[in-house]
Amino acid sequence: MRFCSRVGDRIASALLPALVTVLLASPACRVKEEAITGTFSDTFDRPELGPNWRDTGGGYRITDGQLVAGGAYNHPAWLRKRLPRDVSIELDATSRSPSGDIKIELFGDGESFDPDRGGYVSTGYMLIFGGWNNSLSVICRNNEHDEGRKAARSDRRVEPGRSYHWSITRKGGAIDWKIDGAPFLAWTDPDPLIGSGHEYLAVNDWEAEVRFDNLVIRPAP
């Protein structure tokens, strides 16, 4: 019996580090980032992305005081701050490519990405201006395709090199998106994405070079 006890102790000792690693990696044990309760802003006036952002694929850099994305292939750069449930977001965005494709994610999990350039399913909402070779703009819930598209328009194209000012609010399930002060797309989610796993913002990219600046996030009034 003493032999069995010693063997059991050795097995337990060998398995303990792995068990601890699994537990610490689980959502329940993960340390939550700071919540935005006032006004958060980022003008990107620095040489590197910095600790407030999680680059999941290396497709992001700071150039000329702007956050530049290119060839990220749906590896978002997640802001390490938790969004207010009702939120107001403003930012400036520019595509340098005729393919347009300016996009951000809202209320995602803060870490997910596309591992194989396959069909990307977001953990939050996707707002895409000039996607699919500058042919379609959408608000998506999770999936960018098919049933995931909740509001769409195809009558406006991204002009390469032009800076667009985005204003986005979510109150309850209602998402309202304006560009340069004019209504662009809106949709009300009957089952809003809220709580754990749905608290973060990201900028995202496929191939186009896209630049972001003057990000401001605050609780919606």
Question: What are the residue ranges of the model-derived segments?
Answer:
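Flexible glycan-contacting loops in extracellular carbohydrate-active proteins
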Residues: 188-213
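Short, aromatic/His-centered strand-loop micro-motif at the edge of beta-sheets
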Residues: 143-165
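Short carbohydrate-recognition loop motifs
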Residues: 58-75
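Secretory/extracellular carbohydrate-interaction modules
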Residues: 73-139
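N-terminal Sec signal peptide cleavage junction
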Residues: 27-29
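Extracellular carbohydrate-recognition regions
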Residues: 31-55
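Carbohydrate-binding surfaces in secreted/extracellular proteins
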Residues: 44, 91, 160-188
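Beta-strand-rich interaction surfaces with strong enrichment in secreted/lumenal proteins
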Residues: 75-81, 152-157, 202
